[in-house]
Each structure stands twice: as structure tokens, then as C-alpha cells.
């Protein structure tokens, strides 16, 4: 049985003969990179598993490693692009740096909204253990990013959150659909992102500025210092 046939069989077992209406198999290539983000920079391999962080209505029928075709998609799929930092939701003993893993894969699964209700929001793709060769997947760190600041603009009927992130990228990386960032360092402001109907738009709710390596290191140093003091600056 080929790798493709093994994957088809795994999907059929999980979702029945109508699986092709619920998921699409994607072939890996240099033009279809998939990314995974993590606070852990020492992951040697990714083993597909049943996630404990699923949106309401998301399929629990098959173990997988969740990825996205873009960094923002990973962040949205991660479930928080900033507010959790206000509530000390993450381990305060770490500097909460997000590491970007570019995944190695031959075949991936693009679920439909029937399986992942927010797939249009995150562009989630699954890496599935369908054979001996896909029991684990390798990823290479190609960049990192961290939240530097959260500003809040108070309005009459609510408030707007503005998240300032800094990224250092070792290779060309897709941040959102239609925006590939060249290797280098960037300051990215994400404005009031939230809700499945959110439409990211550069220049509107996403502002990207290329910065120097020295500028990145300066803000990274301040970030680590502020974490050690258990506060954001």
C-alpha cells in the first residue's frame, strides 16, 4: 500500500466512505510549506495525537499534528495572539518566544468546515499518522517571534486591542495569504483581531515594518527583561 493509499484508508476509517467531501489530500512541495508554532525550541519530532485544544464542533476522530500555511494562521489556530499574556496564561518562567517550525511532509490533509469550523480562519492542515513512515514528522526552526506590547484604545462601546509583535525570519516565510516575508526582522502590529469573520488586511488591521537585526535584538532584550520582572513594557 502506498503512502497515499494508507492516508486514504485512515480517512475512510475515521469518516466513512464520504470522507472525500470532508477533507482534501494535499501533496507537499516547495510551493506549499506548512508551519507549526511552539514555545518549545527543542522539539525533535512531531507525533500526531489527539489535541486537547479544539474549537467547538472540531473533529476528534483522528490524531494529527496541526499546521497552517501561514504564520498568522498558526497564531489564530493557537487560540491567542496576545490577550493571554495579560492574564499570565503562559509559563512566566519562560520568555514566551514563539518558534516557527517549517514542517517536512509528503502528504497533508486540508479539513473542511464540517471537521474544523474555523478552518477558513486558520487555514489549518493536518499531518496524520497513516503508516510506519508517518508516525512522526520532522520540523526545522526557521524563525521566531515574541509579543512586545499590548495597547488598548477605549471606545464608547468597547475597546480595541493592538498587539505589537517582533519576528526574526531565517528564510522566506508566508505570514498571511498574499504576504511572503523575506528573510530578516520585522515589527508587526495586529489590530483588534478576533472572530471567525475576521479578514486580515495588510495596511488596515495588519501593519508590517521591516527593521534591522539590532532593533530586533534591542526589543528582544527588553522583552526578556520585562518577563523576568513579570510585566510587559
Where are these regions (language model features)?
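Short aromatic-glycine-(Arg/Gly/Cys) micro-motifs in beta-strand/loop hairpins
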Residues: 39-58
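Short hydrophobic beta-strand segments
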Residues: 30-42
